[in-house]
């Protein structure tokens, strides 16, 4: 049995300015996205697209800026609407109190979809072409976010067997019984494993929309599995059919992603072969 080390959430204190580990993980997520996206510029079909203009670093900068806005706004609104709609409808000004915590991946994803739709429209590019470009660069950012959750000692797992070698006591949970370190599970599943699978998948010739569909299915399945080990939100608990809110939100992702992949697979033309 392990004990969570209760790491100081403040990584660096500069006078009145406190730099939190969680903020650094967001910074790492955006930095990793930029690095991987510049690599994607070398892959087909993006390396050979000329109309309405060649893909460039400026495109990546704009995608990242709009994506950050989508993550923050969508993540916050998603949390308020998916998890505590009654409370925030009664206290709408507290939606702006982001420093109190409360972000939703599913809301952030919707925010990113909307922001990239705007980017695609303004650059006259197919939306799915943009999303296929973005999708393989996302999982490393998710991994960074889960490490932030672990450092903060939040979003811990359900109780585990006392014999589980990596069972961990999270003192912030108010219990000294071992739990699953579900943040680590999500780091490995939604972060590292999804990244490896999707990056390799995206480097081969794919029809437009298949990479996006694969991301939706992959994330949805891995998150659905991880939720069995994650402690449900205490104000929601377990919902219908014994599933958590996170699992229910994954269902349309999996179904929609599978439908998108199938629809894309019916298209006649595939992208040219990718290169390293």
Curated annotation (Swiss-Prot):
Pfam families, A to Z: LGT
Keyword presence, Methyltransferase: no
Ranges annotated as spanning the membrane: 17-37, 63-83, 95-115, 182-202, 209-229, 235-255
EC number(s) given by UniProt: 2.5.1.145
GO molecular function, one term: phosphatidylglycerol-prolipoprotein diacylglyceryl transferase activity
Binding site for a 1,2-diacyl-sn-glycero-3-phospho-(1'-sn-glycerol): 146
Domain of life, per lineage: Bacteria
Predominant subcellular localization, coarse grouping: membrane
S-S bridge residues: none
Protein keywords: Cell inner membrane, Cell membrane, Membrane, Transferase, Transmembrane, Transmembrane helix
Record-linked InterPro entries: Lgt
GO cellular component: plasma membrane
Membrane topology according to the record: Multi-pass membrane protein
Pathway membership: Protein modification; lipoprotein biosynthesis (diacylglyceryl transfer)
GO biological processes: lipoprotein biosynthetic process
Localization per Swiss-Prot or TrEMBL: Cell inner membrane
Transmembrane listed as a keyword: yes
Family label: Belongs to the Lgt family.
HAMAP family: Lgt
The protein's role, per its UniProt record: Catalyzes the transfer of the diacylglyceryl group from phosphatidylglycerol to the sulfhydryl group of the N-terminal cysteine of a prolipoprotein, the first step in the formation of mature lipoproteins.
Protein name per its UniProtKB record: Phosphatidylglycerol--prolipoprotein diacylglyceryl transferase
Gene for this chain: lgt
